[in-house]
Amino acid sequence: MATTSTVSTSSRLQDAQPAFIYGTAWKKDHTKRLVKEALVAGFRRIDTAAQPRHYQEHLVGEALREAYSEGIVTREDIYLQTKYTTPAGQDLSNMPYDPSAPLDNQITTSVSSSLKNLRQQDSVEVATYIDCLLLHSPLPTIEQTLQAWKLLESYVPNQIRALGISNVTLPILQAIYESSSIKPSVVQNRFYPQTRYDVSLRAFCAEHGIMYQSFWTLTGNPALLKSKPVADLTLAADVGRPVALYALVMDLGTVVLNGTTSSGHMHDDLSGILKVQEWATMKPREWATVSASFRGLIDHSQI
């Protein structure tokens, strides 16, 4: 019987909580401090990966355990996701599994490492649960991708609550969806012109209740930052251009990866989205106009 997870796909701008997920890539030894700062600022979704080349998953776990013990958050407050990364995405001298092992062994070893790194308490060996585990990318063949997915299904719903995939095309996502018992709950992709902003893929996600997460939202979109809808919202809501772009992307039904290393920006981004929400509530017609203008740019890549 096909099932889906309980991951909420709601991410419109009007949501009470800004639709950000804190990204922990490239934070190196600063990971623990930055994750705690993000939690203090108000972030409640955390993204990491079992990929020591770019992520320090164990430091994410340390930050979370300290935050739990200090009463900053409870485990139930947090949405926590990590990833299995194939050998092609790893530093072969520092990875969480043996790249020469069979695929199933690679995955089970990686997942075991993540469960230990992200455990809720120091005194227990494994995490109570991980909210979502993503394939960091499709595997070299669709057959291998489906094999990996089937193995991950065995962890749901106990140690892993939901499954997802990153860096995926629509045909591969459709193949997974059609072949799986546990349907994809999350897709995390670059949001930029080269993929035409994943218009068709995002439509598929919306139709099937899949949370679409964007990364490279700022760095991949210098033209969008300069676009008229972003400029208009910046002026009308009295926020910075990055916040205006974030808000408009969220209104597409997207959860935005935010990896800022500035505590000030953490607070400003969260409070800025709330400021746009307030303005949109007070000025619904003006908001509808700027939102429609932005959607026109995205849907037709007119930038």
Set out the residue ranges of the language-model regions.
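N-terminal binding-site loop/beta-alpha segment at the start of enzyme catalytic domains
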Residues: 1-78, 88
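Eukaryotic N-terminal low-complexity, Ser/Thr- and Lys/Arg-rich leader segments
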Residues: 1-17, 30, 69-70, 93-94, ...
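Non-membrane alpha-helical structural segments and their capping/turn regions in soluble enzymes
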Residues: 32, 54, 101-108, 142, ...
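Short amphipathic alpha-helices and their capping/turn segments at secondary-structure boundaries
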Residues: 58-72, 110-123, 202
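A short, structured active-site edge motif that brings together acidic residues
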Residues: 74-89, 132-133, 191
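Glycine/small-residue-rich loop that forms an oxyanion/phosphate-binding "nest" at active or ligand-binding sites
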Residues: 90-120, 132, 142
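Beta/alpha (TIM)-barrel catalytic core signal, keyed to glycine-rich beta->alpha loops juxtaposed to Asp/Glu
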Residues: 112, 119, 123, 127-131, ...
